[in-house]
Amino acid sequence: GIPMESVERSEEILRDVRTTISELVVDVFYKVLADCAKEYDCQFSAECVAPTMVSDGLLHYQMVDLPMGEFWLNSPTHDKLNDMLDAVSGAHIYGKSIIQAEGFTEVRGTWDEHPGMLKALLDRNYALGINRLFYHVYVHNPWLDRKPGMTLDGIGLFFQRDQTWWNKGAKALSDYATRCQALLQYGHPVVDIAVF
Protein backbone atom coordinates (compact mmCIF):
# COMPACT_ATOMS: atom_id res chain seq x y z
CA GLY A 1 0.00 0.00 0.00
CA ILE A 2 0.85 3.65 0.14
CA PRO A 3 2.37 4.85 3.45
CA MET A 4 0.25 7.30 5.44
CA GLU A 5 2.38 10.09 6.95
CA SER A 6 5.40 7.75 7.15
CA VAL A 7 6.32 4.08 6.92
CA GLU A 8 6.60 3.96 10.72
CA ARG A 9 3.12 5.47 11.21
CA SER A 10 1.63 3.11 8.62
CA GLU A 11 3.18 0.13 10.39
CA GLU A 12 1.74 1.33 13.72
CA ILE A 13 -1.74 1.57 12.21
CA LEU A 14 -1.42 -1.82 10.53
CA ARG A 15 -0.29 -3.39 13.81
CA ASP A 16 -3.25 -1.80 15.61
CA VAL A 17 -5.69 -3.14 13.00
CA ARG A 18 -4.19 -6.64 13.22
CA THR A 19 -4.20 -6.61 17.03
CA THR A 20 -7.84 -5.46 17.06
CA ILE A 21 -8.84 -8.26 14.68
CA SER A 22 -6.97 -10.84 16.79
CA GLU A 23 -8.67 -9.67 19.96
CA LEU A 24 -12.09 -9.63 18.29
CA VAL A 25 -11.59 -13.19 17.02
CA VAL A 26 -10.98 -14.24 20.62
CA ASP A 27 -13.76 -12.13 22.17
CA VAL A 28 -16.61 -12.69 19.72
CA PHE A 29 -15.78 -16.17 18.45
CA TYR A 30 -13.63 -18.29 20.77
CA LYS A 31 -14.98 -16.82 24.02
CA VAL A 32 -18.58 -17.20 22.85
CA LEU A 33 -17.98 -20.85 21.92
CA ALA A 34 -16.16 -21.48 25.21
CA ASP A 35 -19.09 -19.99 27.16
CA CYS A 36 -21.58 -22.14 25.22
CA ALA A 37 -19.52 -25.26 25.90
CA LYS A 38 -19.38 -24.49 29.63
CA GLU A 39 -23.12 -23.83 29.71
CA TYR A 40 -23.76 -27.36 28.42
CA ASP A 41 -20.94 -28.94 30.46
CA CYS A 42 -18.91 -29.77 27.35
CA GLN A 43 -15.25 -29.46 26.59
CA PHE A 44 -14.27 -27.04 23.85
CA SER A 45 -11.65 -27.99 21.28
CA ALA A 46 -10.46 -25.73 18.47
CA GLU A 47 -7.72 -25.40 15.92
CA CYS A 48 -5.73 -22.28 15.21
CA VAL A 49 -7.08 -19.76 12.71
CA ALA A 50 -3.63 -18.40 11.84
CA PRO A 51 -2.10 -18.19 9.27
CA THR A 52 -5.25 -18.47 7.15
CA MET A 53 -6.49 -15.16 8.55
CA VAL A 54 -5.11 -12.27 10.55
CA SER A 55 -5.00 -13.50 14.10
CA ASP A 56 -2.64 -14.32 16.92
CA GLY A 57 -1.97 -18.03 16.62
CA LEU A 58 -1.59 -18.42 20.39
CA LEU A 59 -4.06 -15.97 21.91
CA HIS A 60 -7.26 -17.94 21.41
CA TYR A 61 -5.90 -21.12 23.00
CA GLN A 62 -6.58 -19.55 26.40
CA MET A 63 -10.29 -20.09 25.67
CA VAL A 64 -10.19 -23.76 24.67
CA ASP A 65 -10.08 -26.83 26.87
CA LEU A 66 -8.38 -28.97 24.24
CA PRO A 67 -5.96 -27.14 21.92
CA MET A 68 -5.65 -28.71 18.49
CA GLY A 69 -3.43 -28.27 15.47
CA GLU A 70 -3.21 -29.99 12.12
CA PHE A 71 -0.43 -31.68 10.20
CA TRP A 72 -0.58 -32.77 6.59
CA LEU A 73 0.74 -35.74 4.62
CA ASN A 74 2.44 -35.10 1.27
CA SER A 75 0.77 -31.70 0.96
CA PRO A 76 3.48 -29.03 1.20
CA THR A 77 1.19 -26.37 -0.25
CA HIS A 78 -1.18 -26.77 2.69
CA ASP A 79 0.99 -27.85 5.63
CA LYS A 80 1.58 -25.00 8.06
CA LEU A 81 4.30 -25.91 10.56
CA ASN A 82 3.28 -23.11 12.89
CA ASP A 83 -0.18 -24.69 13.14
CA MET A 84 1.15 -27.53 15.31
CA LEU A 85 3.66 -25.29 17.05
CA ASP A 86 0.93 -22.80 17.98
CA ALA A 87 -1.18 -25.60 19.46
CA VAL A 88 1.74 -27.02 21.44
CA SER A 89 2.98 -23.62 22.63
CA GLY A 90 -0.53 -22.42 23.42
CA ALA A 91 -1.19 -25.53 25.50
CA HIS A 92 2.04 -25.03 27.43
CA ILE A 93 1.43 -21.31 27.97
CA TYR A 94 -2.14 -21.78 29.21
CA GLY A 95 -1.57 -24.99 31.19
CA LYS A 96 -3.50 -27.43 28.99
CA SER A 97 -2.31 -31.02 29.31
CA ILE A 98 -3.94 -32.55 26.21
CA ILE A 99 -2.61 -31.35 22.85
CA GLN A 100 -4.54 -32.73 19.92
CA ALA A 101 -3.70 -33.02 16.25
CA GLU A 102 -5.84 -33.53 13.20
CA GLY A 103 -3.32 -35.73 11.50
CA PHE A 104 -2.40 -36.95 8.05
CA THR A 105 -4.67 -34.60 6.13
CA GLU A 106 -3.81 -34.97 2.46
CA VAL A 107 -4.95 -32.72 -0.36
CA ARG A 108 -4.23 -34.91 -3.36
CA GLY A 109 -4.60 -38.44 -2.12
CA THR A 110 -2.94 -41.07 -4.26
CA TRP A 111 -3.47 -44.21 -2.14
CA ASP A 112 0.29 -44.64 -1.80
CA GLU A 113 0.58 -44.09 1.95
CA HIS A 114 1.65 -46.95 4.20
CA PRO A 115 2.19 -47.45 7.95
CA GLY A 116 5.95 -46.77 7.77
CA MET A 117 5.37 -43.41 6.10
CA LEU A 118 2.65 -42.53 8.59
CA LYS A 119 4.68 -43.58 11.64
CA ALA A 120 7.60 -41.34 10.71
CA LEU A 121 5.34 -38.29 10.41
CA LEU A 122 3.45 -39.23 13.57
CA ASP A 123 6.70 -39.58 15.54
CA ARG A 124 7.80 -36.14 14.37
CA ASN A 125 4.59 -34.61 15.71
CA TYR A 126 4.81 -36.53 18.99
CA ALA A 127 8.30 -35.05 19.33
CA LEU A 128 6.86 -31.58 18.71
CA GLY A 129 4.47 -32.10 21.61
CA ILE A 130 1.12 -33.59 20.56
CA ASN A 131 -0.38 -36.32 22.70
CA ARG A 132 -3.75 -37.05 21.09
CA LEU A 133 -4.30 -37.91 17.42
CA PHE A 134 -7.39 -37.63 15.26
CA TYR A 135 -7.02 -39.38 11.93
CA HIS A 136 -8.14 -37.27 9.01
CA VAL A 137 -9.99 -39.12 7.68
CA TYR A 138 -11.47 -42.61 8.01
CA VAL A 139 -13.13 -43.14 4.65
CA HIS A 140 -16.79 -44.08 5.00
CA ASN A 141 -17.77 -47.18 3.06
CA PRO A 142 -21.22 -48.56 3.88
CA TRP A 143 -20.98 -51.14 1.09
CA LEU A 144 -19.25 -54.48 1.37
CA ASP A 145 -19.13 -55.02 -2.39
CA ARG A 146 -17.78 -51.62 -3.55
CA LYS A 147 -14.42 -49.97 -3.11
CA PRO A 148 -12.90 -47.61 -2.11
CA GLY A 149 -15.86 -45.88 -0.47
CA MET A 150 -16.62 -42.20 -0.07
CA THR A 151 -13.27 -40.44 -0.07
CA LEU A 152 -14.14 -36.81 0.65
CA ASP A 153 -13.09 -36.01 -2.91
CA GLY A 154 -9.47 -37.03 -2.44
CA ILE A 155 -8.87 -35.03 0.73
CA GLY A 156 -7.64 -36.82 3.81
CA LEU A 157 -5.86 -40.03 4.65
CA PHE A 158 -7.36 -43.14 3.11
CA PHE A 159 -7.38 -44.92 6.44
CA GLN A 160 -10.03 -47.60 6.04
CA ARG A 161 -10.73 -51.29 5.61
CA ASP A 162 -10.28 -51.29 1.81
CA GLN A 163 -6.69 -50.08 2.04
CA THR A 164 -4.33 -52.81 0.78
CA TRP A 165 -2.36 -52.81 4.03
CA TRP A 166 -5.36 -52.58 6.36
CA ASN A 167 -5.02 -56.15 7.66
CA LYS A 168 -1.23 -56.00 7.65
CA GLY A 169 -0.41 -52.75 9.41
CA ALA A 170 -3.38 -50.63 10.48
CA LYS A 171 -3.86 -52.32 13.85
CA ALA A 172 -0.14 -52.17 14.62
CA LEU A 173 -0.05 -48.45 13.76
CA SER A 174 -3.19 -47.75 15.82
CA ASP A 175 -1.87 -49.74 18.78
CA TYR A 176 1.44 -47.89 18.58
CA ALA A 177 -0.33 -44.52 18.50
CA THR A 178 -2.50 -45.51 21.47
CA ARG A 179 0.53 -46.56 23.55
CA CYS A 180 2.47 -43.41 22.69
CA GLN A 181 -0.46 -41.19 23.56
CA ALA A 182 -1.01 -42.94 26.90
CA LEU A 183 2.62 -42.37 27.87
CA LEU A 184 2.73 -38.80 26.56
CA GLN A 185 -0.49 -37.87 28.37
CA TYR A 186 0.82 -39.41 31.59
CA GLY A 187 4.03 -37.41 31.44
CA HIS A 188 4.68 -33.70 31.69
CA PRO A 189 6.43 -31.64 29.02
CA VAL A 190 9.91 -30.34 29.71
CA VAL A 191 10.78 -27.33 27.59
CA ASP A 192 14.39 -26.22 27.79
CA ILE A 193 14.08 -23.04 25.76
CA ALA A 194 11.36 -20.60 24.75
CA VAL A 195 11.39 -18.86 21.40
CA PHE A 196 9.11 -15.88 20.77
Language model: regions and residue ranges:
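Carbohydrate-binding surfaces of carbohydrate-active enzymes
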Residues: 1-67, 72-196
